[in-house]
């Protein structure tokens, strides 16, 4: 009987530890687009509502640490971010986060990243 209780308690503890390690699920209002770059890297563009504005998260994952990328984000054709990012451990990726206005109608968001050394290009689009 004591062994059975201990086994059930251990199974419950393992289930809780696994559930705690899982990433948070995307909100139902989020818009997430993914795609491949011109080389082996992948991109993800996530748009989320944030206090009447739009949170823009643009991620590039090349699986190689230390790469420098030139990054630009646009909203309805207007640049909202320009800068460089370097891929970092553990996954060889970077992320840019910008919060921008949520204007009337559809907001077209475009992300572009170019690897400074190889010229590999990532281009992603999403609408909110």
Language model features with spans:
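Bacterial N-terminal signal peptides that target proteins for export
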Residues: 1-9
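Short edge beta-strand/loop segments characteristic of extracellular beta-sandwich folds
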Residues: 55-61, 99
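Solvent-exposed serine/threonine-rich low-complexity stretches and specific carbohydrate-binding patches
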Residues: 32-33, 78-91, 126-127
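Exposed aromatic-hydrophobic patches
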Residues: 91-102, 124-125
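Transition segment at domain starts
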Residues: 23-51, 127
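Edge beta-strands of extracellular beta-sandwich domains
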Residues: 111, 117-128
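C-terminal segment of classical bacterial N-terminal signal peptides
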Residues: 15-24
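Short, surface-exposed beta-strand/strand-loop-strand elements in extracellular ectodomains
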Residues: 68-78
């Amino acid at each position: 009987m004591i062994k059975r209780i201990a086994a059930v308690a251990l199974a419950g503890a393992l289930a809780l530890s696994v559930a705690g390690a899982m990433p948070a699920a995307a909100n139902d209002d989020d818009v997430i687009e993914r795609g491949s770059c011109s080389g082996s890297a992948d991109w993800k563009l996530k748009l989320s509502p944030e206090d009447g504005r739009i949170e823009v998260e643009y991620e590039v994952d090349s699986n190689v640490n230390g790469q420098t990328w030139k990054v630009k984000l646009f909203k309805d054709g207007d640049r909202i971010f320009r800068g460089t990012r370097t891929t970092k451990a553990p996954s060889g990726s970077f992320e840019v986060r910008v919060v921008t206005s949520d204007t009337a109608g559809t907001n077209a968001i475009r992300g572009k990243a170019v690897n400074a050394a190889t010229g590999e290009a990532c281009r992603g689009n999403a609408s909110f």
